């Protein structure tokens, strides 16, 4: 449990804390955390992972309140099931079962996540803070 919390939550906090020093000097910036749909909907056998990813949401919202007046935004991008080396090892039956849970009926690509992160990092997203942006094909809608 602690290893997952340390990697996903404590690690993110330490990086954000260090980055914030420079952002405060600039009086602008973006903190972008990569969460997961599992942080909103949970997953059997994944209490540690779900806790670590949902913790990012509270952390981003706290940073948003604390740093917003200084021109710094904080948001979470929350992917669903993603085409990765890890998910490619799943057999076709399991992949189909997972995809059937997703309203769009497929896994997300890494590029689709990167596009959202790029937008959140841009000036066009300057008025978005404290948000969790799902990139999950509708899997977590309503959460």
Each model region followed by its residue ranges:
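Substrate-binding pocket helix/loop in short-chain dehydrogenase/reductase
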Residues: 1-5, 98
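Alpha-helical segment proximal to the catalytic Tyr-Lys
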Residues: 21, 65-69, 126
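Active-site helix of classical SDR
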Residues: 16, 52, 60
């Amino acid at each position: 449990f602690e290893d997952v919390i340390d990697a996903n939550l404590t690690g993110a906090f330490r990086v954000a804390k260090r980055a914030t020093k420079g952002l405060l000097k600039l009086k602008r910036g973006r903190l972008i955390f990569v969460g997961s749909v599992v942080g909103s909907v949970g997953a059997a056998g994944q209490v540690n992972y779900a806790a670590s990813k949902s913790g990012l949401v509270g952390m981003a919202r706290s940073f948003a309140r604390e740093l917003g007046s200084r021109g710094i935004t904080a948001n979470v991008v929350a992917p669903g099931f993603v085409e990765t080396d890890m998910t490619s090892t799943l057999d076709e039956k399991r992949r189909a079962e997972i995809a059937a849970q997703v309203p769009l009926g497929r896994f997300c690509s890494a590029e689709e996540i990167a596009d959202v992160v790029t937008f959140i990092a841009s000036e066009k997203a300057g008025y978005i803070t404290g948000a969790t942006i799902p990139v999950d094909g509708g899997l977590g809608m309503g959460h």
